[in-house]
Amino acid sequence: MALLPTSGILVEAEEFRDFGGWILDSQFDSEMGSPYLLAHGNGKPVTDATTTISAEKGRYNIWVRAKDWVPTHHPGQFTLTINGNTLDTVFGRNGKDWYWQYAGIVDLPGDDTRLVLHDLTGFCGRCDAIFFGKGNASPPNGIDGKARAWRRRLRGIPDQPLDSGSFDVVVVGGGIPGCTAALAAARLGDRVALIQDRPYLGGNASVEIGLTPRGMTNSIIQELSQRDLDGDLVAKQLLDAEPNATTFMEYTVYDAALTDSQITSVKARHARTGKEIRLSAPVFIDCSGKAVLGIFTGAETLFGQESKAMYGESLAPTESDEMHHGHRVFFRTRMGDKVAPFPSVPWATEVAKDYSDLRGQLSKPGLENGP
């Protein structure tokens, strides 16, 4: 059995003080073990992410957890600079999925130490964390309980989540359906908690993407879907104005507890701090889009759209299918007066294969200009 490091300094990328041009991606926490920083620059290297740590004077082994997301082409590459000295190792080109890559030995002076993540390509370099270890044992690479416990211990996070209250209703997922459920329940007098794993509400309709809600709508959906001048939905403002509603932003639900086959509480983890909380209620509404509560509790789940005959739903398709969330390279277009440059992306056809779809182009959030 591999031994885990018992001491050292774990620097989570999501805790960097200045992300620079890097962005926080927290949607794959359950699949790879942590939120991470993403250098999404459309082919132009993004500005550096920086932070400062305090460390005891001494010699440390360094590991960086990164991902080579297209191993045949290595599009997302970056370096790590420590107190002005750039390590020789270039991360994101070792042909491996999420992996703690050893980067050598460094002597730290014993005072503040400055760390810099420097993007080399602008094509989605990914950095999860940096570990300074006193011994030779490498950090745990998995997402099991042992790896989670190791991270908690080094970050000073309690083993048990903080009790953050009891509510009448807990809604998991802050897309349009989740916001609608939370707002309706709050206006009916219920004490509601809404848990959302992103920094914005609205899902695909939020300012992060900007699509207009489709399908059947009602007055609450139309109310939530109005936009501010910056393009964001007014959903957060409406919920903040409700005394019965509490929103937990950037929290990902990772477990649920049952009593006599009924969900009694859920646990959630904050994307930036790792703080873990527990929320209780007699009623839970799963608007995650991924049936996470069903999965955590062992309930039967379905993938895609069931047929009309299965449950007698009038709006269901005649035949079942596997349609679900969109998978596309999303982009915005505008007319120009000259030919625009386009970066070389030799891996693109390997990722997209033979799929193409030009629907859903936006000129700005909420305003589509595609077919």
Where are these regions (language model features)?
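Beta1/beta-strand and adjacent pyrophosphate-binding region of the FAD-binding site
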Residues: 163-175
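N-terminal Rossmann-fold NAD(P) dinucleotide-binding loop
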Residues: 178
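Extracytoplasmic
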Residues: 1-161
